Regions:
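HhH-family (HhH-GPD) DNA N-glycosylase catalytic core used in base-excision repair
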Residues: 1-260
Length: 260
């Protein structure tokens, strides 16, 4: 992709838009973690399913999707009902679950934390949307949501599976989750159900892959994949689409595919 580095603004815009149009399509849902919340029609189920799928979204995508489906099976394919009504006896069998470093004890702690969120806020959407209305800044939202999630007693070990913006993490999985539920278009991929958060407030879900592609395209100079890099690349993408910068998450994925 070296030939793209010296593209003009107009050329880069055309490239990003072309790749966005190619990859922001329903046929790519099945192989992506977003397929897990797409398995449900009730938005409350989608929010829970999406949160747990995003939580384990690192590594091979096929393995992520397969393991996230196992999570849904553990919840009897009724995630919101499970989270709101499960007893200790219902939750204990989750300890047999393992996906890479996310083990059964982590799963139990996350389910109990999710139960607390739903008791206090009703839904995950209400937690995120009310937090944005209160703070008006997505960085503050990510910090507040994490504190609220771990407000109840839990095993400290599980905290590593919920990125901390206060420690400078890129928060890729949280930003991906936010993209799923905040972005609104007519493509049928993202849900766009959280209307109280503007798309312009979103940040790119930055990881090793999208970071490398962003650098190759000349969109990012910072070497570390941390929150500062997330801010930098999103600021650059806002020059191409101020109202919807994270639309180019699809483009960066596509650019990586094309470079292989």
């Amino acid at each position: 992709m070296a030939e793209y580095y010296n593209y003009s603004h107009e050329q880069m815009f055309d490239l990003l838009e072309t790749l966005h149009d190619k990859y922001n399509r329903e046929e790519f849902i099945e192989a992506d973690p977003i397929s897990i919340p797409h398995s449900f029609t009730d938005n409350r189920d989608r929010e829970i399913a999406g949160f747990f799928a995003a939580t384990i979204a690192w590594g091979n995508r096929k393995a992520i999707v397969r393991s996230a489906r196992r999570m849904m099976e553990c919840m009897d394919f009724a995630p919101y009902d499970f989270i709101t009504n499960a007893t200790d006896a219902d939750i204990e069998p989750l300890r047999s679950y393992v996906y890479r470093t996310f083990n059964g004890d982590d799963f139990v702690d996350f389910v109990r934390a999710a139960q607390s969120v739903c008791r206090r806020y009703g839904t995950f959407g209400e937690l995120f949307e009310s937090s944005f209305e209160r703070h008006g800044d997505m960085a503050a939202v990510l910090s507040h949501v994490r504190r609220e999630f771990f407000a109840t007693e839990h095993n400290y070990r599980c905290e590593k599976h919920f990125s901390s913006i206060d420690k400078g993490a890129a928060c890729k999985r949280l930003n991906m989750y936010l993209r799923w539920f905040v972005r609104r278009d007519n493509r049928g991929v993202d849900f766009g159900s959280w209307n109280r958060i503007p798309m312009s407030a979103l940040y790119l879900p930055l990881d090793v892959h999208s970071g490398n592609v962003s650098r190759e395209l000349g969109l990012l100079s910072r070497r570390q994949n941390d929150w500062k890099a997330t801010v930098e690349v999103t600021k650059t993408l806002r020059k191409f689409s101020a109202d919807d910068p994270v639309r180019y998450d699809f483009a960066l994925f596509g650019a990586g595919v094309n470079s292989k």
